[in-house]
Amino acid sequence: MEGRKSGNKELYTKRVHEYDQVINQILKHEQNILSLIKKDTFGAAYKRLVLADDMIYLTTLYLAKFRLSVVLLGGKNENILNEARKTLYKPIIYLEEIVTDLIDAPFSEYEEGVAQISKITEKQRFYLIRKLGLAINLVIDAYGENTKWRWSFIDIEARFAVVAKNIMDLKEISQTGLNPHAEDYDTVIYHLRLVKKLFTKAADKYREKYEIVTNNISDFRNAILFLEGLKRVHMVSNEHREVEEVKRKIDIWKDKMEKDLKQKDKSKK
């Protein structure tokens, strides 16, 4: 039994060393690209897309190290898992730097950023978003349900929802992408469907966070803001019935928020 444990530790050390070498290479490459962006902003948006993709891969490497500790050492290494969680923010930030973090805004307000990645096809954008979404889900699943980070994951998922929407060229999509004969029609539909699902989840989770944990009105406002963003996506998709349904939900939530605000004011007096 002791020999088996010793063998597992040796294998763990060897495999971790291999992963660490790749991790260090990625981190070095990240710093090199950031230095290039600082010196010359030409093509910066494409460079940030590369960085976002690299950081998704980096997250999976930390997850692989974490699984090694579970399989070979029989325990969860929270430090490694925390590195994966912290790394998740990086691809989101790099995407925000390109397409902004605007939750509910006319496309014209962030169109300039989207135009900087015009050579990236809708299929490539959707693939990147799906990879990021998978990495987020894997990290959340690795922590399990009873984690202290449960409520902070809401912010990660919400920010992910925003870049998933903003990376789309909604102007082009509204003009040609919703044509069933368009080349990327299926991809556009699947991407929009994912965005609507993510925005609905973000709104519900912020409302849940407000009701159960914080009682902070800013969480309620965020919930409503995501509903407003969801309504805008339905409008782009020409889904009039869904627009009206979300409008009614917004009105109900706003009414509840106003009542809660009045109650808070009364309690202060």
Model-found features: residue ranges?
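Leu/Val/Ala/Ile-rich N-terminal alpha-helices, chiefly Sec-type signal peptides and the beginnings
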Residues: M1-D104
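Short, charged, amphipathic alpha-helical segments
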Residues: T13, Y46-D53, G75-K86, A115, ...
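Helix-loop junctions that connect tandem helical modules in alpha-solenoid scaffolds
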Residues: D40-A45, Y206-N215, D260
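Amphipathic alpha-helical repeat scaffolds of TPR domains
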Residues: Y46-G74, Y89-E211
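Heptad-repeat amphipathic alpha-helical coiled-coil interaction surface used
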Residues: F66, I92, K196, A203, ...
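Alpha-helical linker/edge segments of TPR/alpha-solenoid repeat scaffolds
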Residues: I120, A142-Y143, I252-K269
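Short acidic, glycine/proline-enriched loop segments that cap or flank alpha-helices
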Residues: I212-R221, S237
